[in-house]
């Protein structure tokens, strides 16, 4: 069946002043792999850009035009600067709360301080934490993580699925014992079919698995419209487009790392 909507994508350099968004039926701002970059870089080729603080100003201005804007993050907002070492990820959670993050998926670095520490942090999160392809045995974490979320924007139902790569070799054995991996493609298709039956007009996969895996998943998928990815730190100046099993176009985006850029997606139904 033909899909009746238009997706327009671009990237925004997160300097001190960035051009705010114009209004559309649905506006999504997306980031990935912040790695505890709270402040802009002070030197180097990205001096004056990046960080949660730069994104804060951009989102504030953009929401004046698009109050229903969805901000999504594709994981690994922890680990990489002294902020994480000194404060154990709490600054990042509070920062994402302040930014009005709607949903994120679990990146491998979210587990760097262990399962109990992650639970402690996520209890303070105001946003949805999504991961559909893990059978989480640790009950405190299982209560905080959901496979998908559905929201309604301007009369349209938007379904968002969280997916995470195989964590074997990336996290501690203590974490692995409590996280049973499920095939990401099978899970994505199962969840997308469920969301389609629930009447979603747009189905998004929020993934932390890298661009190559996103492209493979898109080609073997059904009902997925958009993949917002992370993990490989890929700067996609233009979106990647893949045909799914039904010949429908799946759009894949990723915005580099550290918040130097934010992705912007305008959707008209």
Per-region residue spans from a language model:
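Positively charged n-region of N-terminal signal peptides that target proteins for export
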Residues: 1-4
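Bacterial N-terminal signal peptides
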Residues: 7-16
């Amino acid at each position: 069946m033909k899909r009746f909507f238009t997706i327009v994508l671009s990237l925004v350099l997160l300097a001190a002043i960035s051009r705010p968004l114009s209004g559309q039926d649905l506006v999504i701002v997306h980031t990935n792999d912040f790695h505890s970059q709270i402040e802009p870089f002070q030197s180097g080729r990205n001096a004056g850009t990046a960080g949660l603080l730069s994104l804060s100003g951009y989102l504030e201005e953009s929401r004046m035009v698009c109050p229903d804007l969805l901000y999504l993050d594709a994981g690994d907002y922890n680990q990489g600067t002294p902020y994480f070492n000194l404060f154990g990820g709490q600054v990042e959670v509070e920062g994402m709360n302040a930014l009005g993050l709607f949903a994120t998926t679990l990146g491998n670095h979210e587990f760097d301080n262990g399962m109990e520490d992650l639970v402690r942090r996520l209890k303070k999160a105001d946003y949805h934490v999504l991961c559909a392809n893990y059978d989480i045995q640790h009950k405190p974490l299982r209560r905080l993580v959901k496979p998908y979320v559905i929201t309604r924007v301007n009369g349209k139902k938007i379904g968002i699925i969280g997916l995470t790569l195989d964590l074997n070799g990336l996290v501690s054995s203590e974490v692995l014992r409590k996280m049973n991996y499920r095939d990401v493609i099978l899970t994505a298709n199962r969840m997308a079919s469920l969301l389609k039956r629930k009447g979603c007009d747009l189905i998004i996969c929020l993934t932390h698995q890298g661009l190559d895996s996103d492209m493979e998943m898109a080609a073997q998928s059904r009902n997925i419209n958009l993949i917002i990815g992370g993990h490989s730190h890929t700067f996609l100046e233009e979106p990647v487009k893949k045909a799914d099993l039904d010949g429908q176009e799946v759009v894949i985006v990723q915005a580099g790392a550290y918040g130097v850029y934010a992705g912007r997606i305008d959707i008209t139904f």
